[in-house]
Amino acid sequence: MDAIKKKMQAMKIEKDNALDRADAAEEKVRQMTEKLERIEEELRDTQKKMMQTENDLVKAQEDLSVANTNLEDKEKKVQEAEAEVAALNRRMTLLEEELERAEERLKIATDKLEEATHTADESERVRKVMENRSFQDEERANTVESQEKEAQLLAEEADRKYDEVARKLAMVEADLERAEERAEAGENEIVELEEELRVVGNNLKSLEVSEEKALQREDSYQEQIRTVSVRLKEAETRAEFAERSVQKLQKKVDRLEDELVHEKERYKNISEELDQTFQELSGY
């Protein structure tokens, strides 16, 4: 009987120990389950962040592509402005050559006027010395009149040429104004593009890269942005150079216009002198 009691007590103790071990095992399983749930939650959060990072990188790549396209458009506009400035330079060269030819014609007209004046003086002297030789005086007067008419024709032709030069200069001035407007618009667009690039750069810098691949792609995009910034700076420099060229051309046009006004005044004076000489000869 005592042996049975001892055996039952031992079995009870073993049962209690087994229950304790079972409780400990259940607690351990519960803790491991909670830990596993936390790990799974962290994994889900990490996956969400990775997806957001990928989306941000795709968006940044799209923004960078748009910025590159805009920069190419601006560079194309700058090249067009430079080509237009070169064309204006060629036109200015042609106008200067035409002005030189007009000055040569003016010199010829001036020489004709001097010759006519000299002939008139000679005719006056001869008239006073030999009043009885009216026929010869009349012939000299006719010669002077012919020379005066020829000088007038030359002056009129030169005047027409100068009017044509003035018209062309007005067209060049209008082209220069349009070129300046395009250069200014290009500068404004470049400023806007620079702001867009700055925003893209800030977005790239603010991305949280969680793995090595994302970090490498961000470095690549930042390198592209630096390249685009360098190209943008070059485009701004070229735009500034084009604007300075336009300003120089404008000054040159102003100078040519002043010369035209001066030459027209000289033509006017020559015409008045010719008219006066003709009137004096007609009075004889």
From Swiss-Prot:
Q: Which PROSITE patterns match?
A: TROPOMYOSIN
Alphabetical list of PANTHER family matching this protein = TROPOMYOSIN
Could you tell me which Gene3D superfamilies the record lists for this protein? 1.20.5.170, 1.20.5.340
Signal sequence range: none
InterPro entries under this entry?
Tropomyosin
Specify the domain of life of the species encoding this protein: Eukaryota
Taking the record's annotation, the residue ranges forming a coiled coil are 1-284
Protein role:
Tropomyosin, in association with the troponin complex, plays a central role in the calcium dependent regulation of muscle contraction.
**Pfam families per the UniProt record, alphabetical:** Tropomyosin (PF00261)
Q: What is this protein called?
A: Tropomyosin
What does UniProt say about this protein's domains?
The molecule is in a coiled coil structure that is formed by 2 polypeptide chains. The sequence exhibits a prominent seven-residues periodicity.
Residue ranges for the region (Disordered) are 112-148
**Keywords for this protein:** Coiled coil, Repeat
Q: Which family does it belong to?
A: Belongs to the tropomyosin family.
